Design a protein with these regions (language model features):
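Flexible "cap/lid" loop of the alpha/beta hydrolase fold
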Residues: 101-146
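Catalytic active-site module of serine/aspartate enzymes centered on a nucleophile-bearing elbow/loop
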Residues: 235-270
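Active-site loop/oxyanion-hole signature of alpha/beta-hydrolase fold enzymes
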Residues: 7-15, 40-48, 52-98, 257
C-alpha cells in the first residue's frame, strides 16, 4: 500500500489484506537500515484476524521516498503523522531495535494516539560502536555483515527460518541491494547514537507496554531492556531463551504468540 505522509510517498505492507479504517490499527516499525519485510511473519496473522496492519518502510528505506529522517524524535513524530495520514485516531505500535526508540518517542509525544506499545529487542539508549558507525556512514557493505552477525544469537547463525529457503542473516542483503548502506543504515546508526531521551520518554508512557527480550541479545542486552521496562509505569517483560537481537526472525512464532496475547488483550478487534 502506498500513501502520502507530509507530501512524501510512503510504502507499508498490509499483511496480505486490504487496509480497512473500520478495524483497529497496528503499526510495525523496523530497525536500522531494514524495511517492512522483517515483519512478514507477524503481520499476516493480525491482518487475517480483525486488524488493519501497516508494516511501514521508514522514509528513505525500502519503497518509501527519501530522504531518511535524521533524529529519533522526528521519526517518532513521523509515525504519529502516519496515523493521521490514514485517518485513524489511534494505533497499537510494535517496534524492533531502533523501531523501539521511535515508537517509544511517538507514545511519549502523542499519548492519545497510542493504544498499546510492544518493544522488541529494545533499550533506553542504543549507543553505536564507533567503527561500525564509521563503516555505515561511508557506505561500506561490511557494516551490514557485522551488524547481522552481531544481531543474531547462536541459533540464528544456523538458519531455521520459518519460511523455507530463507536465512535470517541474509535479510541484511536487502540493505546492500537497495544501495542504502550510507543513506539509510548510516543515518539510522547516527540517529540511534545521538538519541539521549529514551528514559525521559519512558517516564511519560501511559499506555500498556510489553518488552520482549532475547537472552542472547548482544546489541540490546537483557539488563538494558530491563532498565527501560523499569522506567515505564505500565510495563511487563517477556524473555525468550536462546534468542539474539533479531527476535522477530529468530523466534518468529514465539514473538507472534506474545504479541497476540498482548495486543488482543489491550486493543481487541471487533
Amino acid at each position: 500500500m502506498k500513501f502520502k505522509v507530509n507530501n512524501k510517498e510512503v510504502y507499508a505492507s498490509t499483511g496480505g489484506q486490504p487496509f480497512d479504517k473500520n478495524k483497529p490499527l497496528i503499526i510495525f516499525v523496523h530497525g536500522s537500515g531494514l524495511s517492512h519485510i522483517t515483519w512478514v511473519l507477524q503481520t499476516r496473522y493480525f491482518a487475517f484476524h480483525g486488524y488493519s496492519v501497516l508494516a511501514i518502510d521508514l522514509p528513505g528505506h525500502g519503497y518509501s521516498e527519501g530522504p531518511s529522517i535524521k533524529s529519533i524524535e522526528e521519526q517518532g513524530k513521523w509515525v504519529a503523522d502516519v496515523i493521521d495520514a490514514v485517518v485513524m485516531k489511534e494505533a497499537s505500535l510494535v517496534g524492533h531495535s531502533q523501531g523501539c526508540l521511535i515508537t517509544l518517542e511517538c507514545a511519549s509525544q502523542f499519548p492519545n494516539k497510542v493504544r498499546s506499545l510492544a518493544l522488541m529487542g529494545g533499550a533506553g539508549a542504543i549507543p553505536m560502536n564507533p567503527e561500525l558507525l564509521e563503516l555505515a556512514e561511508k557506505g561500506d557493505p561490511k557494516a551490514v555483515d557485522l551488524m547481522m552477525d552481531w544481531a543474531h544469537g547462536p541459533a540464528g547463525h544456523f538458519g531455521g527460518h520459518a519460511v523455507p529457503g530463507l536465512h535470517h542473516i541474509n535479510i541484511g542483503g536487502t540493505i546492500v541491494i537497495n544501495g542504502s548502506v550510507k543513506n539509510a543504515l548510516g543515518v539510522d546508526f547516527r540517529a540511534c547514537d545521538n538519541y539521549k531521551n529514551g528514559f525521559e520518554a519512558a517516564k511519560k508512557i501511559k499506555c500498556p507496554t510489553i518488552n520482549i527480550l532475547g537472552d542472547k541479545d548482544r546489541m540490546c542486552p537483557v539488563k538494558e531492556g530491563k532498565k527501560l521496562a523499569d522506567s515505564i509505569k505500565s510495563s511487563e517483560i517477556v524473555i525468550i531463551e536462546n534468542c539474539g537481537h533479531m527476535i522477530l526472525l529468530e523466534e518468529a512464532d514465539k514473538a507472534l504468540a506474545i504479541l497476540k496475547k498482548f495486543i488482543i488483550n489491550h486493543h481487541p478487534s471487533k
